[in-house]
Amino acid sequence: MRDLVVRGASETEIKLAADEIRGKLNPHPAGQMELNVPKLDGEVVAGMQHKYQETVLFFPSQGQTCHRYCTFCFRWAQFVGDKDLKMASTDAEKLHGYLQEHTEVTDLLVTGGDPMVMKTKNLVQYLEPLLQPEFDHIQTIRIGTKALTFWPYRFVTDKDADELIELFAKLVDA
């Protein structure tokens, strides 16, 4: 790559070289795309991983970007524009259906990207239904975010910050 940049290669040539290098990397080690993919009524539930007995990871499509791209990020496959590598869902009903059927799940990790780039209304559709009695087995909801560091305004001055704090209060009080 360095040589391409030094000799003034075209943007297209540099992108092709980067794609070739990226293609040699394993974006989903340990069979994550095959072995940890949950099924509901015999169908694959896109945008989820049931990686550990008690933990489901959910990748909302609205949270598949970040405030900053960290050099150590192991979720890089979410950002390279290859839909075959990306895990993402917009289907709150499938998330809820799967969690209802799997009472061994006590922890939900909402991840991405960074889910806190989403509007609060999107978080509400995924998380507020979990306050219903049929989800009493869900004890922990984690949101994988670096927004407190990179965009603290999300929690204090963004247009929907008050609604976000209200959602968090409901979840904590439950």
Regions found by a protein language model. Give the residues of each.
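Flexible, acidic/Gly-rich N-terminal and inter-domain linker regions that tether
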Residues: 1-51
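Short hydrophobic/aromatic-rich motifs at helix boundaries and adjacent loops
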Residues: 29, 67-68, 98-100
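N-terminal pre-triad scaffold of radical SAM enzymes
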Residues: 41-74
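Conserved alpha-helical substructure of the radical SAM core
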Residues: 49-55, 76-108, 122-126
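Short glycine-rich or small-residue beta-strand-to-loop segments that form or flank ligand, phosphate
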Residues: 57-59, 109-112
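An acidic- and aromatic-residue-enriched active-site/binding cleft used to recognize and process polar
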Residues: 63, 75-78, 113-115, 146-148
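Short helix/loop capping segments that flank catalytic or ligand/cofactor-binding pockets
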Residues: 67-72, 81, 119, 152
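Conserved AdoMet/S-adenosylmethionine-binding subsite of the radical SAM
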Residues: 93-103, 107, 116-174
